Amino acid sequence: MLEGRILADFRQTDASLHQGRPQSSSNSSVPGAPNRVSFAKLREPLEVPGLLDVQTDSFEWLIGSQRWRESAAQRGDATPVGGLEEVLYELSPIEDFSGSMSLSFSDPRFDEVKAPVDECKDKDMTYAAPLFVTAEFINNNTGEIKSQTVFMGGFPMMTEKGTFIINGTERVVVSQLVRSPGVYFDETIDKSTDKLLHSVKVIPSRGAWLEFDVDKRDTVGVRIDRKRRQPVTVLLKALGWSNEQIHERFGFSEIMMGTLEKDNTAGTDEALLDIYRKLRPGEPPTKESAQTLLENLFFKEKRYDLARVGRYKVNKKLGLNAGQPITSSTLTEEDVVATIEYLVRLHEGQTAMTAPGGVEVPVETDDIDHFGNRRLRTVGELIQNQIRVGMSRMERVVRERMTTQDVEAITPQTLINIRPVVAAIKEFFGTSQLSQFMDQNNPLSGLTHKRRLSALGPGGLSRERAGLEVRDVHPSHYGRMCPIETPEGPNIGLIGSLSVYARVNPFGFIETPYRKVVDGVVSDEIHYLTADEEDRHVVAQANSPIDAQGRFVEPRVLVRRKAGEVEYVPSSEVDYMDVSPRQMVSVATAMIPFLEHDDANRALMGANMQRQAVPLVRSEAPLVGTGMELRAAIDAGDVVVADKAGVIEEVSADYITVMADDGTRHTYRMRKFARSNHGTCANQSPIVDAGERVEAGQVIADGPCTQNGEMALGKNLLVAIMPWEGHNYEDAIILSNRLVEEDVLTSIHIEEHEIDARDTKLGAEEITRDIPNVSDEVLADLDERGIVRIGAEVRDGDILVGKVTPKGETELTPEERLLRAIFGEKAREVRDTSLKVPHGESGKVIGIRVFSREDDDELPAGVNELVRVYVAQKRKISDGDKLAGRHGNKGVIGKILPAEDMPFLPDGTPVDIILNTHGVPRRMNIGQILETHLGWVAKSGWNIDVANGVPEWAGKLPENLLSAQPDSIVSTPVFDGAQEAELQGLLSATLPNRDGEVLVDGDGKAKLFDGRSGEPFPYPVTVGYMYIMKLHHLVDDKIHARSTGPYSMITQQPLGGKAQFGGQRFGEMECWAMQAYGAAYTLQELLTIKSDDTVGRVKVYEAIVKGENIPEPGIPESFKVLLKELQSLCLNVEVLSSDGAAIELREGEDEDLERAAANLGINLSRNESASVEDLA
């Protein structure tokens, strides 16, 4: 399947296109796209593939969709088998213990999805389609066949965006990087003798491991299923080999002959018994049971599975069955023998081996971190494995029912129990480490999440055990996994991102495209190569100069060979050439302009921080982009794209109607102010007008973080790079107040608050406006149902939904019984359990959803009514918020200055933001400075003087780049962007402003004036436009102070953390500091009445209220806990006063305490189970 590698063929007849001038607009392939002027010098022969294909293609294989079958037919696969079909074929037939009955499954198919995506999100449903299979029951005694269509449960379906909706939340299944099944040879040095030792592992997809090794005494041994080692000849004899046959095959090897001599087993029977004793110690061995055990371990499909990929890897490594289709996935005798021969030859230092079929294969050890030996389990395979688990559980049930039910009455329906299958699927989507809550901070974060590769998860590595080698960048990652984008913490190197052009082949190996080179001529024929195929070839880089006919200009070309070796070779030796300079990086990394000038550590932070940018009220595309913005935004799926060409018939904020050329009318609904998974605001707005013509694939509405269909994560701000009075020391940032007043960096955040009314033992809870002991002022914004009105401004402690819960009843007095008789249930005691705005939050109510059992809404058991309230908060930029550029340059806002105090340019324009110069040199992210210069050039526009011919520095620029209007948007693709000389030339050629002045000199610096004194600064300052993003680390979410709050149940100390409305811990080291200052009374106060002296803290409150002196502290609760723990160890501990008298710790203080607290209106019953709403 891997042999037919040519998957795309882009031959172009016009020779001038081969190198010539590239198209100057980086967005030219998408209709209606903004005209972004590109500095790219190279033409890319291949469009960026669909960025979600890794998810959608895999799921289509699983369900066996029509589109997948067509693409499989194009690949030359005559009989494609989908993932579900594969599981059913493996499972069928299920036979009973006597073999008289069998049940087989076939033809999986789906009905329509029960509800659309929006309804599933709204009503907490799973976006799923009913799965049906054809089940056939055969009675082998009578030949009777009963066939039925059986329902196998709801099967979660993938949305168009590559996500799943599970119980109303959007989730992503992350692809898993695992070691491929196959045969792996390893080399180690013995510590005592310094001899080279060799070993080999045969690793299956499912089943027992088989390991061979050569030890320091030069004997070849085998370990079966990780049990004790024994001579390898024992296994060969057990497989039926005689001494003569072993001599004939391995006569060339002294170590094999030596092993045979030391082997005491006489023949096959004795060898089998010997193996049985090692595998099943303590059980009486017989020849038959030993034979069955060995066969079941390696040669039976039910117990041992190499999988197609493992079979392919074994065949390739050992040179077996070359060119033949893969049929079996178990081990064969020839595999075992060839593996032993390969190991022996490797140990003896040979470099090649002739396989039984006559194929010569190289003899070498394997690199386990090589991408030829690591494969991807994509979403389809992960779900398939889970279904396989569920089906095997169901198989046991079917077998049992076959033996217990009456043969005449049996039908497929009565045998099958679908519960294990449904449970397995549910468990995977709900709790698996690889099924993750989708990152919806902005469109880029969602797109990156779907393209993520994780080495963690079931069957993968654990972050504690993973060493440096597996985390490191490997030469085989080139074009497959991005070397830049990975997390910074303990998961570094274990989680990666798929490169832009990479794709996954049917075996799960990642392929990357290359242009074929024939006799030194580069063609536009594209070959996709896996990592081990690439090792056999010589590859030139994308920017190797070629002429109009595609020939290399230089006689010697810089290339890379196996294991990342780089050297110059004659052009005739080159086999392939990269398709694009950005081939090696991921989508987020490809959106960093001037990446080639940034240190890799800072580029990593830049790629990661783009995913943390929050959508702003008004998005603005970058002046300096990379040409990746449009494709990333479209493939992320948050913009609206026209399906067909036509004319816009009607436009409003809520929908767009298009009259297509074929006469059909299509209405696209806009998503308005919806809440994303991360509380950001997802809003779509049209960018077309009525009567406008649109083409298929054109963006007609922007989503969050997009402008005109391009990704727009931040704002273009006028930046000055200079120290300013020490206020921007250590990465602090100074902002202009203009950004606050004009809502430049303002974002909207939406919180969802939910409450349900349940049936309790004491009666049903009720959502009502009639709440006990609450004033009318508090209820002013509630409607007659007790639910807050839309548009109400709310702050912490305000009631959103009124709810009362029945209290536990005591024995009623006669008067109460009389009241109950007169007023019925109304006089029952209830307590206020209303939904209130959590501490520290405020905003405007923008939406309410009410679900009720009376309206036939699906609700969990015991819930009668469910209310959701959406509160939106407009957050202006403020001190303490985190801002970042795209080059890993991040900082916290230290000061917001009035615009008139900011440094200003000679024409009076104040800068928006001041960054410190010290943040650049040691971090080596010079890309931010180049971006600042090019940003100024793009904003000002330029005109290159060509009166005396085109200057030398502009020789490679396309003609339309010789001049540009102000406010142009430009792209400088990674590794193929604007050069330093071009930047210097363009800075000297910028257009003057309306006063005829050129404000920034050719070195990119301007004369700045102090906004407070009006005096010029003593030195020129770098000024330009930089793209700045507001990150999700907002000060409003972090700042916190505790008043009266909950206490821990056991220690009675205040809880910690903002979510629990906790206090700040005064820890051991802080106590030392107090001791060092001799602040004894302060320390005593901190450890007693401010913490867990339960009596003291109430008395202190009372003293403060009455204006009296603070009383003496009591005994802390944690001291009493310590005593109890010591007493539980049978130690009699007494507390003595200074004069030696025993102090009695009274237990009965609680009642006095409660009484005193009640008089003061303090509630002491709050403990860790208390919810934050009860604290107001």
Swiss-Prot record:
Comp. bias regions, Polar residues: 13-30
Superkingdom, natural source: Bacteria
One biological process term in Gene Ontology: DNA-templated transcription
E.C. designation(s): 2.7.7.6
Reactions catalysed: RNA(n) + a ribonucleoside 5'-triphosphate = RNA(n+1) + diphosphate
Region (Disordered): 13-35
Single annotated GO MF: DNA binding
Keywords: DNA-directed RNA polymerase, Nucleotidyltransferase, Transcription, Transferase
InterPro entries: DNA-dir_RNA_pol_bsu_ext_1_sf, DNA-dir_RNA_pol_bsu_external_1, DNA-dir_RNA_pol_su2, DNA-dir_RNAP_su2_dom, DNA-dir_RNAP_su2_hyb_sf, RNA_pol_bsu_bac, RNA_pol_bsu_CS, RNA_pol_bsu_protrusion
GO cellular component: DNA-directed RNA polymerase complex
SUPFAM superfamilies attached to this UniProt entry: beta and beta-prime subunits of DNA dependent RNA-polymerase
PANTHER family tied to this protein: DNA-DIRECTED RNA POLYMERASE I SUBUNIT 2
Family membership noted in the UniProt record: Belongs to the RNA polymerase beta chain family.
Protein function: DNA-dependent RNA polymerase catalyzes the transcription of DNA into RNA using the four ribonucleoside triphosphates as substrates.
Subunit structure: The RNAP catalytic core consists of 2 alpha, 1 beta, 1 beta' and 1 omega subunit. When a sigma factor is associated with the core the holoenzyme is formed, which can initiate transcription.
HAMAP family per UniProt: RNApol_bact_RpoB
Protein's name in the database: DNA-directed RNA polymerase subunit beta
Phylogenetic placement of the source organism: Bacteria, Bacillati, Actinomycetota, Actinomycetes, Mycobacteriales
